[in-house]
Amino acid sequence: MWRQMSPELRTAAAKAFWADEQAALEQAEAVALIARQIRFRPKSVMSLPVDKKAKHLGGIAQVSDLLAARMVIAYHLEHQRPMMGAFLDLLGIAHEDGLIKDEEPKKPEDATLDKAVKELSEKFPRQDVARYFWALLWQDPETWGGLKGRPELAID
C-alpha cells in the first residue's frame, strides 16, 4: 500500500509518524533508512527538522512493512479520525475520537459490517476508505478479517 500512495500522501504520513511518541523503534529504523539514502550519519538525520525528515522518508517508496504500516496508522490518527469514528459508529463499536475503547473489540457481524462498509464508502473518498480498511486488517486481522476480499480494498 505504501508504494501505491502518492509522494505527497507518503510525506503527510511520515510527518504524522515523526510526531508519534510510541513509534521510537520504527523511527530508529527510519533514521537509518534516510541516513543510507542521503549518505548522512544517523545522528545528523536525527537533528534534521521534522519537515525535512518527513520529506526524505516520504520520498522513499521501498520501506519495511512494519515501518509502512506504522506510518499509515499515524496518518489515519492525524488526518482521518472523522472517517474512523464514522465507521465505528456504523458498527456500534465504542470509541473515543476514532480510537476503539475496548482492548479486544468483538468481531463485527457480517451483515453489520456489510452495511457499515457500504455506508462509509458512500460518505468518504474511495482511496481513503481502502487505506483505512488495509490499516485495520494489518492491525488486527482476526477482528477485521471480514474486510478481506472486498472491492473497497482496491487501491489504484
Task: Spell out what each predicted region is.
Residues M1-A23:
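Charged, amphipathic alpha-helical stretches
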Residues A19-G146:
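Acidic, low-complexity, intrinsically disordered interaction modules
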